[in-house]
UniProtKB/Swiss-Prot annotation:
The active site is at 8 (proton acceptor), 131 (proton donor). One of its GO terms (cellular component) is cytoplasm. It holds the Pfam family His_biosynth. One of its GO terms (biological process) is L-histidine biosynthetic process. This is 1-(5-phosphoribosyl)-5-[(5-phosphoribosylamino)methylideneamino] imidazole-4-carboxamide isomerase. It is found in: Cytoplasm. Pathway: Amino-acid biosynthesis; L-histidine biosynthesis; L-histidine from 5-phospho-alpha-D-ribose 1-diphosphate: step 4/9. SUPFAM superfamilies: Ribulose-phoshate binding barrel (SSF51366). One of its GO terms (molecular function) is 1-(5-phosphoribosyl)-5-[(5-phosphoribosylamino)methylideneamino]imidazole-4-carboxamide isomerase activity. InterPro entries: Aldolase_TIM, His_biosynth, HisA_bact_arch, Isoase_HisA-like, Isoase_HisA-like_bact, RibuloseP-bd_barrel. Belongs to the HisA/HisF family.
Amino acid sequence: MLLIPAIDLKDGHCVRLKQGDMDQSTTFGEDPAAMARKWVDAGARRLHLVDLNGAFAGAPKNHAAIKAILKEVGDDLPVQLGGGIRDLDTIEKYIDGGLRYVIIGTAAVKNPGFLKDACSAFGGHIIVGLDAKDGKVATDGWSKLTGHEVVDLAKRFEDWGVESIVYTDIGRDGMLSGINIEATVKLAQALTIPVIASGGLAGMADIEQLCAVESEGVEGVICGRAIYSGDLDFAAAQARADELNGAA
């Protein structure tokens, strides 16, 4: 089970939002590269970056912070990034710059042709981020709820060659209310590609529940507010996950 620390970038700083609201942000650090190093030193085996300004603007914004993170830890572990990725040129620049995975969210839903092209051009590097509430997909920084069913869309994307799905329950994100295990497992069972859980991780009990369903196709979990607020000790949680799943 991969525990993946999230570094959410707003105006060059590390922040956490409450339920995706840019007006409800808490700053946890002003040096994103140092934050990345902290999580790597604590045992992280992948990092999850979000360009929040990019997600809302529809174009990459936190260039300097992302570059600094990749320079600091890019050789140590895979880094994945979402937020504002809307064209192939952006993907190419990120991958050439050392990013392992790009996460396409809104654009995958609104412009499926772009996602298809991205999978063709950058096979093995494309993750889709599906944000949902009550099983329905949301777009545009969670501000718009669509009529699309999560499972139906994910199956289509799987057919196109997407590497994995990051599934976020937006009713829980940043609320420390617990991962929506049932919905995450339902999605994972419908797919052959891995699912990464996100949204609401509250503590060690969530980690233990996720480890119990790893065999269903839940590969990892994004660790956000809980590891910044102190509700979850990241190093201890990754060690516990490894113990439960028999990893070295």
